[in-house]
Regions:
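C-terminal transmembrane helix pair
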Residues: 173-264
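Transmembrane helix-bundle signature of multi-pass membrane transporters/permeases
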Residues: 1, 29-38, 91-98, 122-134, ...
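Juxtamembrane helix-loop transition segments at the membrane interface in multi-pass membrane proteins
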Residues: 8-30, 112, 138-157, 219-239
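Structural signature of hydrophobic alpha-helical transmembrane segments
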Residues: 1-6, 56-69, 126, 205, ...
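Transmembrane helical segments that form the transport core of multi-pass membrane transport proteins
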Residues: 85-157
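Alpha-helical transmembrane segments of multipass membrane proteins
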Residues: 2-6, 10, 36-40, 44, ...
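Helix-loop-helix junctions within the multi-pass membrane cores of secondary transporters/permeases
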Residues: 135-192
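Helix-coil boundary and interhelical linker segments in multi-pass alpha-helical membrane proteins
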Residues: 45-58, 109-123, 186-199, 256-264
Length: 264
């Protein structure tokens, strides 16, 4: 259900970027990742409710799994070279991304008691992970565009042009994470949720955000650069690996920062 909405919004944003002259690297990648998070969670809740009320859950699951495998087999063997290449490059990286996201969920589940002790952290968590993923997506998209257009060399050591993009994203990350902490604290106070002090929450967010930003730069650059150097499509590899890796490590660094500050 979620992918239908996200796919439609992606096409709309791409068309709008061309029509209105928006910077596609700064608009499409972060908005699509954010909207994906926004639509996926309600879709999962709705699907769980429908499955719980249906007496045909097992049969429906088997049918959907069969159809999915059939579609994948057809797409894998499709005669069009370009489409076949997209499918064969996308499936492995999306599979790895799914595993990373599952491990991230398991990490959060294991420390759920710590998160429930400061409910503002649960308010902050989706915004924190979404922000980290959006920033990484912007960097990966920018680098991919530069490599494709020959404006930058995909070298193991980032060039000056790549470093400018990296510095821009690092500078942008600090105020964005701080604003996220402020909003999470205000929302928690307004809804009667437990929260550490504002100072503690800001420190937790900056510590976790700093660690995540370092990893975001590393994963975004070397995934995009590596894909380009090996003749693969960096757009296919960069953003999925960045967002899924940051989901995993972002959850871990947030919990680590909670422990370091003494909130958990």
């Amino acid at each position: 259900m979620a992918w239908v909405v996200v796919a439609g919004l992606t096409v709309g944003l791409a068309a709008g970027s061309v029509r209105f002259g928006w910077d596609r690297d700064n608009v499409i990648a972060p908005l699509v990742t954010t909207l994906g998070d926004l639509r996926t969670v309600p879709a999962l809740v709705l699907a769980a409710v429908l499955a719980d009320r249906s007496g045909l859950t097992d049969g429906l699951a088997a049918a959907l799994a069969t159809v999915s495998v059939g579609v994948l087999v057809v797409a894998w063997r499709i005669p069009t070279d370009r489409l076949r290449g997209i499918v064969r490059q996308s499936v492995p990286v999306l599979g790895v991304a799914a595993v990373f996201d599952l491990v991230a969920g398991l990490t959060l589940e294991k420390r759920l008691d710590d998160l429930l002790a400061a409910e503002a952290i649960l308010v902050l968590l989706p915004a924190f992970l979404g922000t980290a993923g959006a920033l990484g997506a912007i960097l990966s998209s920018r680098l991919s565009t530069q490599f494709h257009l020959g404006l930058d060399d995909a070298t193991p050591v980032p060039s000056r042009s790549s470093m400018r993009n990296i510095v821009d994203l690092v500078v942008l990350a600090v105020p964005v994470f701080v604003v996220g902490a402020l909003v999470a604290h205000l929302v928690a106070q307004a809804t009667g949720q437990s929260s550490p002090s504002l100072a503690d929450l800001v420190v937790v967010t900056i510590l976790a955000g700093g660690l995540v930003t370092v990893l975001m730069v590393f994963v975004a650059y070397y995934t995009t650069m590596g894909a380009f150097r090996f003749g693969l499509d960096p757009d296919t590899y960069g953003i999925p690996m960045v967002t899924s890796t940051l989901d995993l490590v972002g959850a871990f660094t947030l919990i680590l920062a909670l422990v370091a500050v003494g909130v958990a």
